Amino acid sequence: MPRLNCVAATAIIAFVVALNIAEGARRTPVVRQVDHIVIESGDPRILFNFFAETLQLPIAWPITENQGFVSGGIGAGNVNLEIFRYASTPRNRNASYSGLAFEPYPLPDALRDLKLRGIPYSTPEAYVSLLPSGSRGTAWTTVALPAFSRPGMSIFLYEYSPLFLKIEVRRKQLANRLTLSKGGPLGLSSLSEVSIATTDKKRDSAAWSALLGKPAQSGNWRAGAGPAIRLVQGGGEGIREITLSVESLEMARDFLKKSRLMGATSGKGMLINASRIQGLRILITGEGER
């Protein structure tokens, strides 16, 4: 009997291990897609107006101020841009890409999968607010991912409560508004890529592969309909640049020239003049160039 019990126990352990491995491999990547890109600005209203008025992109949420914290959201087709300023942020500072928020699969599942993959995460933090029903409850929950975050760049999971916002519905609404406006004067189709500078590409590539799965042939990672993630060796650590894909490079070029927004050009496309957008790097490419 002891021997049989030992054999049975070994079989059960092997089954559980195999089940855990299968469960861990079942959902790759852990996240659905990038939900929004965080941009910190000393003058967020000016930058918000550039996207909302000059580029005529749909407003995801209006710019508001609460106890010195200013935040506004812009829809870029497949992802949002959050432009904000902390109360302590100097008003004369340039803008910078300071964070990347990922929409996870249901958060309990995502946290379990992170644990299986050996990816550390912080304690979930719920933001309590007034819900559309009139009651108070959790509006969204964030979970920091310290293995990916760097000074000046926060990488985190961000899950909306369905009682506060149905994210898929809002994403479709914003995408439809962009389509109806034909992408604004720029002819925007989507935000196709986020470029992240790293001092150790091998280390960070392994980390991103653990989170998002095997990279594409291009070397980039993509989750769902969100922008691709591209690692670039050198130049410090943090989000360096975002890429906007447009229907017609010629139309976009004409608009940038007429608006005095044209920056440097390259084989891939052209940059918006950084001096007009508080120092941000925004590359414009054709749909087939990404």
How would you name each of these model-derived features?
Residues M1-C6:
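Positively charged n-region of N-terminal signal peptides that target proteins for export
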Residues A8-N20:
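Bacterial N-terminal signal peptides
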Residues R32-G42, G72-I74, P90-G187, S190-D200, Q217-N220, G226-Q233, R253-R290, ...:
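Vicinal oxygen chelate
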